[in-house]
């Protein structure tokens, strides 16, 4: 297997699926993905148990096609996981079962699913166009840049995913934005506390015993 060619083909597939289902921006929601799942005949099984290293799995057997998702995942990880499993639907159905955990995360099939998901949620071409429009030159992308980009596009690609993309495309030096921790804190510094988070904190404060 030519890995680079395989990954490039998956990016092309991601673009085709986006176009087929009318996705034209960097914001791909769970609702969008559920709609695609429904058209593809994929059932969703929300698993109530917590897994330390497993977010989802794809099953294709005599009962049909099912994607198991860890219930309660936040919006960004849920969207990425659903897009990840969608790659297995298109390319790996003959395997019967596809899942990603620490034992196989470096295998081409799973890396390919990550490549597909990142391109599906925020295509490289759109990422480049947005950064160019923001006046960000090669090697000059900072954590602040990515916070502004996420705010502008409302993408469901996580900060970690955006950081990987920024370094791979040359907008940030290697091991700079991917090494950054504290995305939510930086987001709050730049844009203020999310009102829902503020309300939740206020409620918790009122509920504390004297």
Per-region residue spans from a language model:
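Active-site hotspot residues in diverse enzymes, especially metal/ion-binding acidic/histidine motifs
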Residues: 1-210
């Amino acid at each position: 297997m030519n890995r680079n060619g395989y990954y490039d083909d998956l990016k092309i597939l991601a673009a085709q699926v986006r176009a087929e289902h009318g996705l034209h921006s960097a914001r791909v929601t769970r609702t969008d993905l559920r709609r695609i799942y429904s058209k593809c005949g994929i059932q969703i099984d929300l698993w109530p148990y917590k897994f330390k290293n497993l977010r989802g799995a794809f099953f294709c057997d005599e009962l049909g096609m099912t994607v198991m998702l860890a219930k309660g995942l936040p919006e960004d990880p849920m969207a990425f996981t659903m897009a990840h499993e969608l790659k297995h639907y298109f390319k790996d159905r003959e395997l019967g079962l596809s899942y990603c955990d620490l034992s196989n995360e470096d295998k081409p099939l799973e890396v390919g699913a990550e490549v597909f998901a990142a391109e599906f949620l925020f295509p490289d071409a759109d990422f480049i166009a947005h950064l160019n429009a923001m006046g960000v030159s090669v090697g000059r992308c900072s954590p602040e840049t990515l916070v502004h980009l996420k705010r502008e596009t409302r993408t469901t690609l996580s900060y970690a995913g955006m950081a990987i993309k920024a370094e791979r495309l040359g907008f940030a030096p290697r091991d700079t934005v991917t090494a950054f921790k504290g995305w939510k804190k930086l987001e709050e510094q730049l844009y203020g506390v999310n009102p829902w988070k503020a309300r939740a904190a206020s409620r918790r404060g009122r509920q504390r015993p004297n």
